[in-house]
């Protein structure tokens, strides 16, 4: 089960953090809609991991003392590119690393294999540390640059899932996470046309990945 909680307020189902904040998984569940939340139960949501282990041990579960996984549990070897190729049946061709001016500075193993903010595993000797600053999936290019190039003051997106209300109609102060392990950051979310909304951060945020799901506390 997942560490999260669902509560009903009026006619709306709301997604709440788990009692065990260290194990909370609401970041990964933030795209669940009202129909899905109405049919979901999270029996672990009100328990801590220690309490779950104690219950498992009392009932003779052999994995009661199993160490917690520290990464994606279904990719035990940590080779995500190889997993993607096995899972999708696709081959991801090599492409170019570019600097901020668009100059080719090296070759990569496929843009899908990299994440914004990544430093390790690039295989580049640039004279100074560089990080993944952007990706063009159509052109299969990965742009690298200094750490300061990773900061954003806002993000804009569509296909939002609203829990307290059907639609966002006015600006709302929120706290936002753009990564699972991140501490919530203050900001304001503004409605825009055609289902889009824009979040402006009080403080610029590092490595706001375009493809990430973002969760906010309303």
Question: Which residues fall in each region the model found?
Answer:
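Nucleotide-activated chemistry modules centered on ATP-dependent adenylation/adenylyltransferase
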Residues: 1-216
């Amino acid at each position: 089960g997942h560490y999260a909680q669902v509560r009903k307020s009026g006619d709306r189902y709301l997604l709440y953090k788990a009692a065990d904040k260290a194990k909370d998984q609401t970041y990964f569940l933030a795209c669940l809609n009202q129909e899905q939340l109405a049919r979901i139960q999270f029996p672990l949501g009100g328990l801590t991991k220690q309490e779950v282990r104690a219950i498992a041990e009392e009932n003779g579960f052999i994995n009661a003392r199993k160490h917690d996984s520290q990464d994606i549990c279904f990719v035990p070897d940590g080779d995500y590119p190889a997993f993607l190729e096995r899972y999708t049946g696709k081959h991801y061709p090599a492409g170019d690393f570019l600097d901020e001016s668009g100059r080719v500075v090296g070759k990569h193993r496929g843009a899908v294999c990299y994440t914004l903010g990544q430093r390790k595993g690039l295989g580049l000797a640039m004279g100074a540390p560089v990080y993944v600053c952007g990706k063009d999936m159509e052109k299969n290019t990965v742009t690298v640059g200094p750490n300061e190039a990773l900061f954003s003051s806002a993000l804009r997106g569509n296909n939002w899932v609203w829990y307290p209300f059907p639609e966002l109609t006015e600006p709302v102060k929120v706290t936002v996470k753009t990564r699972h392990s991140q501490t919530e950051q203050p900001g304001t979310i503004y409605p825009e046309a055609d289902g889009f909304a824009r979040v402006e951060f009080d403080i610029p945020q590092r490595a706001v990945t375009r493809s990430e799901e973002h969760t906010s506390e309303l």
